[in-house]
Swiss-Prot record:
Record function comment: NDH-1 shuttles electrons from NADH, via FMN and iron-sulfur (Fe-S) centers, to quinones in the respiratory chain. The immediate electron acceptor for the enzyme in this species is believed to be ubiquinone. Couples the redox reaction to proton translocation (for every two electrons transferred, four hydrogen ions are translocated across the cytoplasmic membrane), and thus conserves the redox energy in a proton gradient.
Region called Disordered, residue ranges: 187-211
E.C. number: 7.1.1.-
Localization per record: Cell inner membrane
Catalytic activity: a quinone + NADH + 5 H(+)(in) = a quinol + NAD(+) + 4 H(+)(out)
Gene Ontology molecular function, alphabetical: 4 iron, 4 sulfur cluster binding; iron ion binding; NADH dehydrogenase (ubiquinone) activity; NADH:ubiquinone reductase (non-electrogenic) activity; quinone binding
GO cellular component, one term: respiratory chain complex I
Organism: Gluconacetobacter diazotrophicus (strain ATCC 49037 / DSM 5601 / CCUG 37298 / CIP 103539 / LMG 7603 / PAl5)
Entry's family note: Belongs to the complex I 20 kDa subunit family.
Binding site for [4Fe-4S] cluster: C54, C55, C120, C149
Gene Ontology BP terms: aerobic respiration; electron transport coupled proton transport
Protein's name in the database: NADH-quinone oxidoreductase subunit B 1
Length: 211
């Protein structure tokens, strides 16, 4: 930070003018209102404290000091869906539980997002039976899929960053009086496809008994 002082009645000189111009350039931010709203939303996603099964343990681990999810502005866990805008479906979704999950989702604030965490939430996992929903996307609009059984907390954080990138590029009306009443959602890229070349080039794999 730079600053300068002038005496009362003193004429500002050229060096001070240059300093003020430089200061204005560093501190004045110009842009569209929608861009600022999207920036604020993507950096202040409030997750709903909700879990279903084993993957919830890994989700809770992501909020510990080791992983420090506060870096992404998502450390504010909400105990009620009316104050949250993100729900992480972490675990097995049974048919009897699906209406309750949908009811909780309907109470969330707009705009709201869904992360499907784990194989059971993504596709039913190993439970190919009548009592388990074969994919939470059959009744909820899923924004990000996090694979694994269960996924590591690092994978959830990577999914959160992927969600933030898509939220930052979404366009939504700021008022019912302005523009169409739809939300232009951006399809998140597939990280499996993005990392394919890097994985193919790997020649040394870590030992399975290490972390």
């Amino acid at each position: 930070m730079r600053w300068s002082l002038t005496r009362p009645g003193e004429e500002p000189g050229t060096p001070r003018d240059a300093t003020m111009t430089e200061t204005v350039k560093r501190n004045l931010v110009m842009g569209r209102l929608q861009d600022f709203v999207s920036w604020g939303q993507k950096n202040s996603i409030w997750p709903f404290n909700f879990g279903l099964s084993c993957c919830y343990v890994e989700m809770a681990t992501a909020f510990t000091s080791k992983y420090d999810i506060a870096r992404f502005g998502s450390e504010v866990l909400r105990a009620t869906p009316r104050e949250a805008d993100l729900i992480v479906i972490s675990g097995t979704v049974f048919v009897k539980m699906a209406p309750i999950v949908k009811y909780l989702y309907d109470q969330m604030l707009e705009p709201r997002w869904v992360i499907s965490m784990g194989s059971c939430a993504n596709s039913g996992g190993m439970y190919d039976i009548y009592s388990v929903v074969q994919g939470v996307d059959s009744f909820l609009p899923v924004d990000v899929y996090v694979p694994g059984c269960p996924p590591r907390p690092d994978a959830l954080l990577e999914g959160l960053m992927l969600l933030q990138d898509s939220v930052g590029t979404q366009r939504r009306p700021l008022s019912w009086m302005v523009g169409p009443q739809g939300v232009e959602r951006v399809t998140p890229p597939s990280l499996r496809d993005a990392k394919r070349d890097q994985r193919r080039a790997a020649q040394t794999l870590r030992s399975p008994d290490t972390i």
